[in-house]
Amino acid sequence: MKIKILFLILLLSNVAKSQQKLYTKNGSITFTSKAPVQTIEAVNNKVLSVWETATGNIEFSLLIKGFQFPKALMQEHFNENYLESDKFPKAIFKGVIENSKNILFTNDNVINVKVNGLLTMHGISKQITIPAAIKIKKGEVSALSNFIISLDDYAIKIPSVVSESINKKINVQINIPLFKPLTK
């Protein structure tokens, strides 16, 4: 009888954990443009993300002006001329993790997944699929992703004067160091 009760408690705790919302306010997104003249990199360390583990729904949101560049002039051009951050202040990704029901939160492991969703940036929404690695260690959950986007897909125009300095294919790296349970 005691074994049945213990098993039931373990089962219910795993079900409860698998149905929670996990979030972070301190995720980071780094983008890199490698071009013949220079490499440009910027980081935004204030990425908000919420993951509903029961459904696999996941969302990322960030303010475009949150990207930090090594040079102030780069940041100014990025916000005013390319991403027009006053007009389009946010980038948002809403997606679903494929086969999320197979993720066991009780085991330490790394699970490679695909995330299908809609990336909205610069006023344009585009369906994309991105690879991600979800790491579970001692009950803590983190996630990494690395993928490429095209500036043309989001109508981001690069003047010909600087076209040798900016690659139209941008590498995007997402790092969510620790998801925490979202409490009401």
Model regions and ranges:
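Bacterial Sec-dependent N-terminal signal peptides
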Residues: M1-K21
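Low-complexity, acidic/polar, glycine-enriched regions of mature
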Residues: Q19-K184
